[in-house]
A protein has these predicted regions:
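Non-transmembrane functional regions of envelope-associated proteins
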Residues: 1-108, 166-250
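Short, solvent-exposed coil/turn linker segments
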Residues: 11-13, 128-129, 145, 154, ...
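Flexible, solvent-exposed extracytoplasmic
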Residues: 78-80, 119-123, 162-165
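Helix-enriched interaction subdomains in cytosolic or periplasmic regions
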Residues: 109-142
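Structured core elements
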Residues: 114, 171-174, 259
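A Trp-anchored, charged/polar loop motif used as the substrate-binding/catalytic surface
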Residues: 133-161
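Hydrophobic transmembrane alpha-helices
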Residues: 238, 242-270
């Protein structure tokens, strides 16, 4: 089985356990997903927001006080399946990196990494779920009404199955309906109107998965390079301000000469 279900950490339950006001049986923990018992492959879908409410970071894993375990986030849980790792495999902290298989993922802070967004909403290709379900054994409403089999999944000539579109791909199933309110503001926008920096949760996780697959990461700038950039910009600013100052002095001198000549003309009527 290569399926991962989305799960959540119940923050209220976790808080009660931390305060020792509740004792929840670990055996009943299903991470708010009724399908968890079918495979026990779960990924947490609770990314952290920054202070401005924008989502820029991703947690490789989250610790559950209920189960006393580290649980991989959704993107990492899917990659566990892709790389053939155990379901509960989590990234390991090592210096300034998280180690995940043979990947070295730069850390932003102790617990998170930065997401290198590939674009705004709609960057990753989408396929309607009904087009996947519509095989020779499933009747859609359109097929019933028209009396014709469409079978977009497995029709021989142009079906999605024979197209190879899903071969060796990581496929995420999620809602792209605004009514479901699974929208996250990110640091990347189309720039056409206010609020077009929103992407759906399924797209959010797709970005970190693609980052890891392609090794395309964002790193925090080192303190040394920050200092060099500050010194460089300071020197440039000083040079530009000095140059402008000299120009102003020259212009001022020319203005004074022009005024002196004008006064001479006025006095002597030249």
């Amino acid at each position: 089985r290569k399926v991962v279900v989305a799960g959540k950490i119940n923050e209220l339950t976790e808080q009660k356990i931390e305060e020792r006001t509740s004792w929840v049986g670990r055996i009943n923990e299903n991470y708010d997903n009724i399908f968890y018992s079918a495979d026990s492959s779960v990924g947490i879908v609770q990314p952290p927001a920054d202070y401005d409410g924008v989502y820029r970071r991703y947690l490789p894993y989250i610790q559950s006080d209920v189960t006393q375990k580290l649980v991989p986030s959704f993107g990492y849980a899917l990659l566990n399946k892709y790389y053939g790792l155990k379901n509960n495999t989590t990234a390991k902290r090592s210096g300034n990196y998280f180690l995940f298989g043979d990947k070295k993922i730069p850390r932003y802070d102790r617990f998170s990494t930065l997401i290198n967004f590939y674009g705004s909403s709609g960057t990753f290709p989408r396929v309607k779920l009904i087009d996947i379900l519509d095989d020779k054994n499933f009747k859609t409403i359109d097929e019933i009404n028209l009396g014709v089999d469409i079978n977009t999944w497995d029709v021989s000539d142009y079906g999605l199955l024979s197209s190879g579109r899903f071969k060796d791909k990581v496929v995420l199933i999620g809602s792209t309906m605004p009514e479901d309110r699974d929208l996250l503001p990110i640091s990347f926008a189309k720039g056409k109107q206010k609020g077009d920096n929103l992407i759906y949760g399924v797209e959010f996780h797709a970005n970190i998965i693609q980052n890891i697959l392609s090794g395309n990461f964002l790193s925090v700038q080192s303190k040394e390079s920050e200092l060099l950039v500050i010194l460089y910009l300071t020197a440039i600013s000083f040079y530009i301000s000095s140059f402008i100052r000299k120009i102003k002095l020259r212009i001022g001198f020319l203005v004074e000469v022009a005024n002196f000549i004008f006064v001479l003309f006025s006095i002597y009527g030249i």
